[in-house]
């Protein structure tokens, strides 16, 4: 097995657990499918994002397990700002960890900029997910655009 990270271009479907999560996660998010998103996570998954305190009125940005993650995905589906787009060019993986960027510059304008970093378990479910925000995305939070 090659432990070196691999860069992959997006294809029409996913044949490995990494590809399945990469395509299914983006698809569920773009359709505001909170249940579809949650189904990609292990029951005891850990999710971290600056959006957690913003939408759930919590001090911590860390959620543990489906019971804590579900309310975030429900609110995210209902409140996602229109500036949220889904342009990306591929991902990096070592077979267990999955990393991709939603870059600010899409070539057709700006979108909210994130890096999604996930670790999958042996069942191919997301065990740990950290979302890192770029400056354009942080400005969306500062302007309170998720509370529409």
Q: Model regions: which residues?
A:
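Short charge-dense sequence patches
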Residues: 16-29, 63-69, 124, 128-129
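A solvent-exposed, acidic/Ser-Thr-rich amphipathic alpha-helical stretch
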Residues: 15, 34-38, 42-96
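Generic alpha-helix detector with strongest preference for long hydrophobic helices that associate
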Residues: 6, 18-22, 50-54, 99, ...
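A beta-strand edge to alpha-helix "cap/lid" segment located at domain peripheries
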Residues: 2-13, 70, 74-148
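Short, low-complexity N-terminal intrinsically disordered segments enriched in polar/charged residues
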Residues: 1-39, 43, 144-148
């Amino acid at each position: 097995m090659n432990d070196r990270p691999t860069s992959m271009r997006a294809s029409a479907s996913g044949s490995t657990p990494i590809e399945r999560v990469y395509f299914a996660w983006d698809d569920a998010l773009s359709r505001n499918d909170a249940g579809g998103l949650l189904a990609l996570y292990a029951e005891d998954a850990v999710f971290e994002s600056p959006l957690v305190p913003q939408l759930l009125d919590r001090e911590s940005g860390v959620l543990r397990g489906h019971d804590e993650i579900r309310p975030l995905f429900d609110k995210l589906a209902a409140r996602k700002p229109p500036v949220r787009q889904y342009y990306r060019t591929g991902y990096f993986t070592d077979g267990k960890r999955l990393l991709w960027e939603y870059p600010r510059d899409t070539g057709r304008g700006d979108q909210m900029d994130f890096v999604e970093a996930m670790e999958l378990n042996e069942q191919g479910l997301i065990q740990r997910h950290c979302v890192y925000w770029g400056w354009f995305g942080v400005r969306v939070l500062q302007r309170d655009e998720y509370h529409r």
